[in-house]
Amino acid sequence: MSEPKPMQMSVETETVLNVSQVQIPSSCDRKASLETLKTKKNAQKKKKISLPNVMTSKAAMFAARVASAVDQDPNDEESENFVYENLIPTNDDELHSPSASIHSFQTYNLPLEMLPTINHVPYYGSAGTNALNGGPLSNSRKLIPKRSAKFSSMVGSSDTRCNSPTTARGLATSPLQINPTTSKSPLLNKKLSSTSQEPFRTSRRSGQESGDVTTKMLRNLLHKRLWISFFFACFVVLSLVYFHYAVQPLL
């Protein structure tokens, strides 16, 4: 191998005469120098990212916020840490919460048969107060959502028995939204409807009875007035007859 040739550098010099301070004008010292007092700042405008008005889920919102934070200030690590620390759940309870990246029913766009089933909350099970001898309502009974069902924010149950996959996705029904009469037999529904209408029937009967009493009282009063007027007419007729036959001949 051939050895590399050494580099040759040439330096050009030029002699300059010394300039005395007398030749320099005095006005140079009086000029205000702004460049020496203030340093230039690299002013970078933050990019504004237009987010869509409608977000399908919290996961999309999280991704949009992270992307906007990274695009706005790529060199600032504190802003990225702030976004991640505030949005990532730390506890196990928060991981199973309904608000952790839930997709609504509209984003799935699945038919009714493909949707996941909704289990009953165990408050209406065999040990609950609404179960009839442990029969009609149990934990194994399931409900199928309607086609017009939309996503609504539901508060997760604090009971540890409800930690099923459906409750983790926020699809479990809360005990306040369950109507126990809808899943019962038609005969039981008829009995319940009849019992619920009994107060109205009793009030109607009491009103009819009060009306009958008032009509009876009015009839009795009318009969009394008729009898009084009849006796008064008889008295007037008898007095006229007595005056005509007994008193008039004497005059």
From Swiss-Prot:
GO terms for biological process: phosphatidylinositol metabolic process. It is a single-pass type II membrane protein. One of its GO terms (cellular component) is PAS complex. Residues 154-167 have a biased composition (Polar residues). Residues 154-212 are annotated as: Disordered. The chain crosses the membrane at residues 227-247. Glycans are attached at N18. Component of the PI(3,5)P2 regulatory complex. It is found in: Endoplasmic reticulum membrane; Golgi apparatus membrane; Vacuole membrane. This is Vacuolar segregation protein 7. Keywords: Endoplasmic reticulum, Glycoprotein, Golgi apparatus, Membrane, Signal-anchor, Transmembrane, Transmembrane helix, Vacuole. Residues 181-196 have a biased composition (Low complexity). Pfam families: Vac7. Component of the PI(3,5)P2 regulatory complex that regulates both the synthesis and turnover of phosphatidylinositol 3,5-bisphosphate (PtdIns(3,5)P2). Directly involved in vacuolar membrane scission. Required for normal vacuole acidification, inheritance and morphology.
